[in-house]
Amino acid sequence: MTVSPSALAELGFNYQEEDSVRPWAAVLVDLPQNEGVYTYAIPPGLTVQDGDIVAVPFGNQQLGGIVVGCLTKLPPDLPPEKIKPIQDVIVSGFFAPHYWRLLHWLAEYYCTELITVIRMALPPGLLQRSQRRIKLNGDRLPSDWPLFLSQPSHQGARQILTLLQSSKEGDYSYRYLRQKVPGLTKALRDLLKRQWVESYLEPPKAVQPQLPKMVTLLNFDPSFKLTELQARTLIVLKNQGGEMWLADLLKAVPCSASTIQSLAKKGLVAIAEREKLRLFQQPSINASQAPELTPAQKQACQTVLPLQGYHQVLLHGVTGSGKTEVYLQICGDRLGKGQSVLVLVPEIGLTPQLTDRFRARFGNKVAVYHSGLSSGEKYDTWRQTLLGHEQIVIGTRSAIFTPLPNLGLIILDEEHDSSFKQTQLTPNYHARTVAQRRAELEQCPLILGSATPSLESWHTVHRHQNDPQRHYLELPERVQSRPLPPVQIVDMRAELKQGNRSIFSRALQTALGELKAKQQQGILFINRRGHSTFVSCRSCGYVLECPNCDVSLSYHYVQGNGQPLLRCHYCNHAEIQPKVCPECSSPYLKFFGSGTQKVTEALTQEFPDLRWIRFDSDTTRRKGAHRALLDQFQRGEADLLVGTQMLTKGLDLAQITLVGVVAADSLLNFADYRSAERGFQTLTQVSGRAGRGEEPGQVIIQTYTPRHPVIQAVKTHNYHGFIAQELPQREMLNYPPYGKLILLRCLGTNEREVEKTIQAIAVLCEQLLPKTVEILGPAPASILRIAQRYRWQLLVKYPSFIKVILPLERIKQICPSSVYLDIDVDPLSID
């Protein structure tokens, strides 16, 4: 039976009716590449409210949708007979009112569809497609049906009924029957017409709760006649508090399931299914006590603890100043008041260390949420947050959407970090911006912590320094009065002139040589993974490039007997390293630039006694790899961590005394207005990993531009001096934090069509946007082609004190189906 979709609801129609009887609902239907709000009838006896997740018929399928409003009157020109009923409510009241408002705001602010925001915010599995199933209608099936279908023309129908009768439930999926029965469609149509079978759509299923069996001790009576195995089973169960998961009990005794069943028949134990949350498994942590606070830490806590309602706090503390302890003190206060806390970190690699410290203080009240979890673990973490108990969730940017009850505090640690901005998927949201809006809606304080605050956060709090809801708190010294590590700048031009061809300067070589003797550990930071930045022919100059992108391929060394690879870091294309030049067949190929693999190769050659661990996105892809590598390092199984940006983000390893920056210039030479800020933040953060323990630290930065303003600011740990130089340049050009930016980018396989589309969008924006808005471009992106798609863009720039609303519907009408439009509000990069 084909069911036509309900008529499309009228755009702009008011769905927020206040009458008590509201027989229709506007449902945002989950359709691929489309956001459709459709009107459905609410069946008698079914309670539906805004934010419910419902199953609705749409054509010949059943889809998931979100109720966005209920109404007493139909939109004009919408006949009641066309309205189909909602099938069922999958999750009732899933969105709290303030959460619902957050999603609406996010869709509007980031210029995207509400359904896109909902798909991103929900855990996996809540809006999945249903499947069609065929069920035997036993009441209508005549007993002599085999005789009736004995004709050869009825062979398909006979096969269907035979299969259905062999099924315990009397039904199979349409997909399964199609595989088993040739010519299924005609035979099934015949059976449906006779009403011997039914066709139905199984409601969309969320990721299901895990329901293993729990064994509970009911009676421990020695007078019962028991076998030795049964008695031992009861003793094990009693010693474990009277309750154990069945699987655990079978291993602990050990015994078989029949032994447990026999005890249940005697009435000594009960066996029942019980939900077991698939929370991320973490090692046990010893409890810790709060240390003595420094005067600055005490002042910070005294300022934040009394805050009620929305407040924004910028906690600016130098590396090693004890920001995390301030977080812990304030979190303890919030938990004591029955409130929950959300803690966001920029990288998965940071969650193990931070989680361990929180769990040592707060035990099992701490949960984690990030992209490294399985779908089941994500789903169950959401379920745990909905139970209503006060708790702490620690996670990466996606954790901002966890529905914590009675939220009392949001913390963004390392708030300056670019990883808080989503750039690979729509919407291109920034977790800091969303956190600010969520804190406003839920009326709780927001703490932004960093040793190198973003210029936006710094400017906001100082521009509103008389606002009682804005607070600037500073931790200017390290705990226990430990000094910041001295920073030595090495001019690599001088090294080359004096005959040093190594990637390590003589100063760094000396420090590395002393590391083993002093039984200390260190970090080597390089801004690129892989071995070499590009491969070029020394005979003809040919550079090996990606066939899909306008970029060179990076050389990656493969361990063991594997062949060396050339890999694209944009589309992940990989090919075997050729032995001769593809252009002129010359065997003289040269590798240029350095990555983490090349650094470790040089270490092995020059310092064979030093043990190292590579810590980059190539070595941490596997689940749990971040923790495993850091634990290995903390146990003293390596002398050096060699890695990329991950090493700069809040790692607190007391045994590190040396930090070496192999090539600082790779952070500075970008055609982007944020280049200096990012370079200063990265170099300052990685420098701050040294000297956090009892032993003093040292930092060696290798560069070809030692007089660069960023290098000089990092040398003296001078954040205030850096921003005093950087902010006037931003203000002069009206770049953030003084101006606002929106990047519109068109992508497609036909370059001329992409260019033509972005030019038409630019003309439209010039016509419709206020004169105070500046349109820069259109122009090709700095990398014109990625993954075989050409990229053209324009930048909308305007003063931060005005509000600009893009003519989205008009812009979308300009874009043909072959051109994808990406809108990035507040872009962190305009390349």
Curated annotation (Swiss-Prot):
It is an enzyme of class 5 (isomerase). GO terms for biological process: DNA recombination; DNA replication; DNA replication initiation; DNA replication, synthesis of primer; double-strand break repair. Gene3D superfamilies: P-loop containing nucleotide triphosphate hydrolases, PriA, 3(prime) DNA-binding domain. One of its GO terms (cellular component) is primosome complex. Its cofactor is Zn(2+). It holds the Pfam family PriA_C. InterPro entries: DEAD/DEAH_box_helicase_dom, Helicase_ATP-bd, Helicase_C-like, P-loop_NTPase, PriA, PriA_3primeBD, PriA_3primeBD_sf, PriA_C. Belongs to the helicase family. PriA subfamily. Initiates the restart of stalled replication forks, which reloads the replicative helicase on sites other than the origin of replication. Recognizes and binds to abandoned replication forks and remodels them to uncover a helicase loading site. Promotes assembly of the primosome at these replication forks. This is Replication restart protein PriA. It comes from Synechocystis sp. (strain ATCC 27184 / PCC 6803 / Kazusa). The gene is priA.
